[in-house]
Amino acid sequence: MHFRRTMSRVPTLASLEIRYKKSFGHKFRDFIALCGHYFAPVKKYIFPSFIAVHYFYTISLTLITSILLYPIKNTRYIDTLFLAAGAVTQGGLNTVDINNLSLYQQIVLYIVCCISTPIAVHSCLAFVRLYWFERYFDGIRDSSRRNFKMRRTKTILERELTARTMTKNRTGTQRTSYPRKQAKTDDFQEKLFSGEMVNRDEQDSVHSDQNSHDISRDSSNNNTNHNGSSGSLDDFVKEDETDDNGEYQENNSYSTVGSSSNTVADESLNQKPKPSSLRFDEPHSKQRPARVPSEKFAKRRGSRDISPADMYRSIMMLQGKHEATAEDEGPPLVIGSPADGTRYKSNVNKLKKATGINGNKIKIRDKGNESNTDQNSVSSEANSTASVSDESSLHTNFGNKVPSLRTNTHRSNSGPIAITDNAETDKKHGPSIQFDITKPPRKISKRVSTFDDLNPKSSVLYRKKASKKYLMKHFPKARRIRQQIKRRLSTGSIEKNSSNNVSDRKPITDMDDDDDDDDNDGDNNEEYFADNESGDEDERVQQSEPHSDSELKSHQQQQEKHQLQQNLHRMYKTKSFDDNRSRAVPMERSRTIDMAEAKDLNELARTPDFQKMVYQNWKAHHRKKPNFRKRGWNNKIFEHGPYASDSDRNYPDNSNTGNSILHYAESILHHDGSHKNGSEEASSDSNENIYSTNGGSDHNGLNNYPTYNDDEEGYYGLHFDTDYDLDPRHDLSKGSGKTYLSWQPTIGRNSNFLGLTRAQKDELGGVEYRAIKLLCTILVVYYVGWHIVAFVMLVPWIILKKHYSEVVRDDGVSPTWWGFWTAMSAFNDLGLTLTPNSMMSFNKAVYPLIVMIWFIIIGNTGFPILLRCIIWIMFKISPDLSQMRESLGFLLDHPRRCFTLLFPKAATWWLLLTLAGLNITDWILFIILDFGSTVVKSLSKGYRVLVGLFQSVSTRTAGFSVVDLSQLHPSIQVSYMLMMYVSVLPLAISIRRTNVYEEQSLGLYGDMGGEPEDTDTEDDGNDEDDDEENESHEGQSSQRSSSNNNNNNNRKKKKKKKTENPNEISTKSFIGAHLRKQLSFDLWFLFLGLFIICICEGDKIKDVQEPNFNIFAILFEIVSAYGTVGLSLGYPDTNQSFSRQFTTLSKLVIIAMLIRGKNRGLPYSLDRAIILPSDRLEHIDHLEGMKLKRQARTNTEDPMTEHFKRSFTDVKHRWGALKRKTTHSRNPKRSSTTL
């Protein structure tokens, strides 16, 4: 009741209300949303598209600027309006001298020009789309951050697994020694795992004498070595490595079970075996020099290639380590790893106790239903008085991927491997070995917390096995094996082993109890046995046992009740313990993770603690570790991995974490199915062919790639190491999806994602949102930064150059203000200067001309090129797997989804080549036609070249004049006029042909192929053939020859039309459609304006006294205004543009040309980069996806690149055909001359 009364007081606290105080940004967004709600009808009918909004913005800003300029009243309003329109549109045409304006008016023009440039307008659009993303996608900021961490975690795991695969294959190809001996072993191993009854002595009958001698010598070595340190397993390992000429010195943890166990030789093997004793022949034992006799160990094999001799020898050695102690003292046997640095001797005779089994049995048991390991036994009956007499039970985790060794005396069907010692067999071939192999299931780490968790050096690590049904599918005759297992389980023919010691401690857990529903499916009845040793062992298991069967049952029930669901914040902490805390064996602390509850990699990668652990582990090895030299594949590429030496392992124990993580990650990647379109389709049949046995082509088994079912996969490079010969930032998912998406997208042309689900759209929207957010920052820094750099480069120069300072001062302008204004005018391509004669006064100033050339280019047509270059450089130098790198990668791969002036790689290269070609063409024409003209005769040749370059660059965008254009060659004037018209076309075509909805914007909703044309061609061809057939019946030979020639020609044309690629027709149609649409947009307006001005200025045109007032000068002015360039032929004795001589109506026409030309480079109304996130956008995406699915065409190559590739290929083939034809035509002549 006290607890209930306490709870009743909780609602009193809930009545306290704290009002949320909105931030300024939140209030501003709410205000915009409120305005949008009230102006929704206006937006729908007056501003239906971005182009309409842009027109409104340009006209409104022009009127506002004119209103701001006119109060000074130093000019007429039409001239003020004309000047305002030129500043807003960057047209650069002026009817008044800028230096005659007041400083206030100049500042207004400065600010207005800066906020109305294409870069500023499109950047504002990017900010608007960023705002709309936050409004449309609820919580997109947090969800995008979560998705990024999930993708980063998966990318780390996949990179390490891929690196491991490549390293395994590479390492395996380099170790191919002893191929002849290996072939025999492979044949035996093939028989071993095919389930056949084989005799090991038959396999190696040729070497039986030598092997018998080796066995005897090994037994005598055991007798000698168990009393001294020379008999330790370290000596065996070192001797084995030395004999191999250092081939595996870096793999010292790969010898055998004994090499990883911190034990000494067997006491019980100190007696020489009798001839009638059970023998295991060791194949391919290498001849060693006659020095100190020692135990021989086989080379490191895969977990499926362990020979019975190695297993039996390891068992006997482990058993012989025991010493006589009390029955209730000491811990179980602890098997450490070579990396522990010290070897511990444990008192093993404490484990000796009568188990109720015959004294000549040796039983190996990995107890614990909580870990679901199999329970088997190994027995051998000695035929002499010197048989093994002690009985013990060894508790260790020998691995999980090698078949067990079982007795066949009473239960021949109870284990996968049975050893028989029959009388007949002893007489003929010795003991025979029967193998009945089943695939041991994979185990997943589990952890049990006990009171010993208080001790940081004690731990218990349990393991959980995967489904037996799945694992059995990896072997032939899997159905038969599963049936045998079911029969064994149904008959209960499994020997329950008693143990020596009672586990006095009960596990303490606060986990759920529903963890073992799928564990006790009989899997614990298939005990297996493997040598599980490595310096980077991620699991060290130590278990205790009850005294009797009843205690064993109760202990197992307790363990089953408390199956662990490890909290992820304790993932990387495990401890080991033994039964006697005061005598605890100090073991190296490992960091593992409980992944049993993760159903797939996506679920695991979304766990925050797991993400943090993986990233910290990766960053510790990839960012903090110094890498002063690059290592190749043969130069210790895995310095801290399984192939590392002991000296290289002295760094933080992070590889164990990587081993555990990647072991589970790889199993999930293969086991749970493929990741397609964001969904994981678990398919058991799809994984049947993943597990493949490699025939043992490598002597050491390194080519046998340990798949995800192998517990030892951490030994083959499953660690976090940057020292593989790969680019650490290499995009492993190239061609199979990018790292910024967790699913494999289907992408059409121009970054059109097809067939997305709601979750995928949200994830893609989050990635696009963060990319736009980063892009907005880049745009602001770009725009403001280059403005600062421009005036920083010009202001000091004009101040230091006294001559040019005086020129500026004579025009009534401060040199400092000239530097600021000229820098702005050059970067924004305004074309207006504070000096009346534009840049003619600086035609010999090399420095400002070169600086202005750079800023003219990067401020307009070169902006997309430089922007992509900056993003690419940032991508290269950004931290790997960072959020910035992911966003930059998305911008590089799908630029037109985010920004209108950012193009893909191919389109950017084409734009660069186009701009360079146009500028170089103008430059060459100027040098050819005007290099010796009177207008530049006063300049030296070097200055003439520089003036030509500056004028060719200014002609297309800026409108600066460094020479009198009216004095140039007429052909140069025509070329300049043409360049002013096409100035924006490369940029406009690039914008439109990279549009995500390119086909819809052009009105092309079907295949652009030529099926109707092909049909018509075939019909025409048939008609022609019929006509030719009719003509062939005529009797005249001339008609026959002409008809044959026509037939051949028509057939060639027909074949050419048929073989023409429909995609090529589509490419040509797209490019042609863009050009036709652009011309239809431009030409009628240009000629309409020319017509109106000719009407208004007819009298001046006809006046003979004004020869410079002609139609060409008017057309030049119109094209300059329409191209927003600002070049003008001028009028004699004036500094202003030619437009100053126009009437008011003609000036209004020029203003209309300026506003119209400002919008000619905009994208179509149907463009992904200008449509705000809304239901309309989703509807358009749906229509586009349906159309492309119907067309079954998802070509992502750039159309122009594809077209030119085909054209080049066609030209190449035609050239080759022409050469062959010429060669064939020459050969008959040569043969005839020789005759």
From Swiss-Prot:
The modification Phosphoserine is found at residues 15, 414, 534. Residues 198-217, 540-563 have a biased composition (Basic and acidic residues). GO terms for cellular component: cell periphery; membrane raft; plasma membrane. Residues 161-310, 323-344, 361-441, 488-565, 671-706, 1003-1063 are annotated as: Disordered. Residues 219-232, 1036-1049 have a biased composition (Low complexity). InterPro entries: Cat_transpt, K/Na_transp_Trk1/HKT1, Trk1_fungi, TrkH_K-transport. Its main location: membrane. Belongs to the TrkH potassium transport family. This protein is required for high-affinity potassium transport. This is High-affinity potassium transport protein. It comes from Saccharomyces cerevisiae (strain ATCC 204508 / S288c). The lineage of its organism: Eukaryota, Fungi, Dikarya, Ascomycota, Saccharomycotina.
